[in-house]
Amino acid sequence: MGSAEDAVKEKLLWNVKKEVKQIMEEAVTRKFVHEDSSHIIALCGAVEACLLHQLRRRAAGFLRSDKMAALFTKVGKTCPVAEDICHKVQELQQQAEGRKPSGGSQEALRKQGSTGGKAPALSPQALKHIWVRTALMEKVLDRVVQYLAENCSKYYEKEALLADPVFGPILACLLVGPCALEYTKLKTADHYWTDPSADELVQRHRIRGPPNRQDSPAKRPALGIRKRHSSGSASEDRLAACAREYVESLHQNSRTRLLYGKNNVLVQPKEDMEAVPGYLSLHQSAENLTLKWTPNQLMNGTLGDSELEKSVYWDYALVVPFSQIVCIHCHQQKSGGTLVLVSQDGIQRPPLHFPQGGHLLSFLSCLENGLLPRGQLEPPLWTQQGKGKVFPKLRKRSSIRSIDVEELGVGRATDYVFRIIYPGHRHEHNAGDMIEMQGFGPSLTAWHLEPLCSQGSSCLSCSSSSSPYATPSHCSCIPDRLPLRLLCESMKRQIVSRAFYGWLAYCRHLSTVRTHLSALVHHNIIPPDRPPGASGGLTKDVWSKYQKDEKNYKELELLRQVYYGGVEHEIRKDVWPFLLGHYKFGMSKKEMEQVDTAVAARYQQVLAEWKACEVVVRQREREAHPATLTKFSSGSSIDSHVQRLVHRDSTISNDVFISVDDLEPSGPQDLEDSKPKREQEPGAGTPGIAAAEQQSVEFDSPDSGLPSSRNYSVASGIQSSLDEAQSVGFEDDGAGEDGSEGPATAAHTFPGPHDPGQETLAPASELEAGQELAAVCAAAYTIELLDTVALNLHRIDKDVQRCDRNYWYFTTSNLERLRDIMCSYVWEHLDMGYVQGMCDLLAPLLVILDNDQLAYSCFSHLMKRMGQNFPSGGAMDSHFANMRSLIQILDSELFELMHQNGDYTHFYFCYRWFLLDFKRELLYEDVFAVWEVIWAARRISSEHFVLFIALALVEAYREIIRDNNMDFTDIIKFFNERAERHDAQEILRIARDLVHKVQMLIDNK
């Protein structure tokens, strides 16, 4: 039962977190939050659910239906803030009910921001959550919730969320941010609509289909001048633009209001075909009222890439301005209702079949409201108390007399004819109507051409000529046409000159491409079809043949298959060590076993070293903890501690560590007398126990205020420890990283290597030996080294705890293995240390390889490339510069858009992509596929293939970015929402095409 209650409380709190995130994002992206925003209503609903959870009946009131009112009223007796909210809500309710409040109440409302002494009208949703909403608008909701959490015993049961010692304060803290925002009442142009989500933008783009892209820049531009509206490409672009505008108009935006929308409305476009379901919508703009109907096939994007089929369904779509409609025929049947629109020329539009459920009446009601105040329906709809709008009760006329249908018991009329009339413009077009009724339809065209005829030549000889293009030799109007001819000749010269200089700029552009982008790709193009079969990838059969006969299979051919088709999942465990450099292609099994043995011995040695150092670190924490509490309880060193925090390095994590400068030993010799006592299992460094210890005590780090004389580099600290202790060093073998040396800090021989397959903790005897060894070797560690190790252990523990916990593989035992591997790598690279994100790179390797030693070796090889992306390296700046060059050359239109909208051509939104090789952008299965292609591309096409994947991600959504005119904030929000929803195979295909395009540009073929 307890677990079920906890699950309910976690769900309630999670809903509040989600709504708080939404409202904070709106405040950042739109620079304001309107009081009528839907996010405010959603947040109030989530908070109200938390406040009502397990509320005592006495606090809620036995007979009151409004429990929130009872709660605030009861709390207001002892909480002044809640009492003020009660007064303000009472005033708002009086305004909503139409009763005029007192003068003092009007003054209070005027202070809230109402203008002219009139309070703004509240929507029904705002009235529903008026108590929580008012507290939020007054910026005191967090204080009210905090008061309820502190006095929960008066108002809540023991199982309530606010009675929980953890969840209650968390809820109050979550509301601090929304209570700090400024809410506006200003009616802005985009007040009635909110920015669509990434999913909705993608859905809109899918409806209208991908328009044609611009020509490839690899082709030399033609010097011919393309005539407007004469080529097929121009018409296709125009149709694509029309389709885009049509789809955007279906949604509510700043220009139009959506009055009505209903799906599955049937229309029969032709007599010989079945009715087609579609989406019917009614839109109101400043000038007109428009009805639109779109087939469901277009709305759902289920037509694929068949342009012919799409064009057919686009022909079925309806766009009907109501300024052209004079009457509406309505027919009611048991299966629903049918509506027929009749135009001014008497033509009937295709019938619209509404489903059952009163949808026809609902549409007419929205139409009548949209026609006001300039137009109206004749006869108007009736209003019936308790039901709202109803059809008018009319009498049917017979040839003999008027018969009341209802009196005869037959029932109400089922067929209606409504006229659309505009009382103020009734006789505006009478003249035109008379002409058309008399049969002079062509006179309308003549009326349109009249202004052109009036501007004709005044020369009688020209006007009397039989041909409009023939000019008599004796014509006197030739001087009038001479400036026009000179203008045409001048335009011709300008066009030719512009074409020439464009061609010259293009040639110079190609020269720039070859100069700056030649290093990004291999010049030798390796196609997928020579020999064929590379698109199928590296299969299990091909790999088994390679293992049987390594000599007849070339490494480049295997990598080509991986690059174009990936690796079959069953053999990834065997192939990845080759791709990462742990094994070399062509190695025999004996040579591979030798490499594995050397790596296992190396890993166990490093594991023993840092675990021995960890014992000293934990012992140092336990000794410093009591004295630290005493020091802070006295309050004597708080000011000095704050001063030391000012000198923290800003590049390190913002975690606050308690300073123990005054308690540190004066030198390593003081540590020799202190033997660490075994108070925990050797797994004390595991995430769970380490996290528990971190809550009780933290210690000083190199970036938490140490004196400047001790803030020298980590490498110098390690070297001093080596000199003092005369410790034993070791060199990297061939399987480890080239040129890297691990810090040898122990002065004695370390325990032997553990069993490579063992996942449990070491035996107690080995642990005791390691503890004694750590006590003996404590003098080998300088304070700087211990601080550095402790800081990195803290960061690793914090990151391991939250690393992909939703993925099935990462159980507690596997997280412990992940920590051991990461600590071993960081121990060998203390100059770099641990940086957030390294666990994300190690986790997929451990999932596939499922071997600690192998994952450690492969991760070390991977970090040779990825380590440069972290702050200690400089690869990130070069990535941004190369991305700028690539997109400027391959997609100049999108580059200009980025430059105009706040100049986000620095591509900082790609930082996480490059840092983690797109690990957080893709699902785990897609991460495997993308990573192996990146590794194979280093030999096949480009050592910088990550650039082309990043560019492919941008190109995949370029039309959405361009059509919505996204700025830097919008594009970050868009890609964050699209994380783990990308089509990885499509992204890889685009990336490979981009590489080939750059290769062709350089080769100029």
Curated annotation (Swiss-Prot):
CC annotations in GO: melanosome
Domain Rab-GAP TBC, residue spans: 566-938
Skewed-composition ranges (Basic and acidic residues): 672-681
UniProt key word Phosphoprotein: yes
Localization (cell): Cytoplasm; Melanosome
Domain of life: Eukaryota
Acidic residues composition-biased segments: 730-740
Domain (RUN): residue spans on this chain: 34-191
Any Pfam family the entry gives: RUN
The UniProt record lists the keyword Phosphoprotein: yes
InterPro entries per record: Rab-GAP-TBC_dom, Rab-GAP_TBC_sf, Run_dom, Run_dom_sf, RUN_SGSM2, SGSM1/2, SGSM1/2_RBD
Disordered as annotated region, ranges: 95-121, 205-236, 657-687, 729-761
Residue numbers carrying Phosphoserine: S402
Primary localisation category: cytoplasm
MF terms in GO: GTPase activator activity; small GTPase binding
Entry keyword set: Cytoplasm, GTPase activation, Phosphoprotein
CDD domains given in the database record: PH_RUTBC, RUN_SGSM2
Matches recorded under PANTHER family: SMALL G PROTEIN SIGNALING MODULATOR 2 (PTHR22957:SF194), TBC1 DOMAIN FAMILY MEMBER GTPASE-ACTIVATING PROTEIN (PTHR22957)
Entry note about domains: The Rab-GAP TBC domain possesses GTPase activator activity.
Biological role stated in the UniProt entry: Possesses GTPase activator activity towards RAB32, RAB33B and RAB38. Regulates the trafficking of melanogenic enzymes TYR, TYRP1 and DCT/TYRP2 to melanosomes in melanocytes by inactivating RAB32 and RAB38. Inhibits RAB32 and RAB38 activation both directly by promoting their GTPase activity and indirectly by disrupting the RAB9A-HPS4 interaction which is required for RAB32/38 activation.
Assembly and binders: Interacts with RAB4A, RAB11A, RAP1A, RAP1B, RAP2A and RAP2B. No interaction with RAB27A. Interacts with RAB9A.
Protein family (similarity comment): Belongs to the RUTBC family.
Record-given protein name: Small G protein signaling modulator 2
Source organism of this protein record: Mus musculus (Mouse)
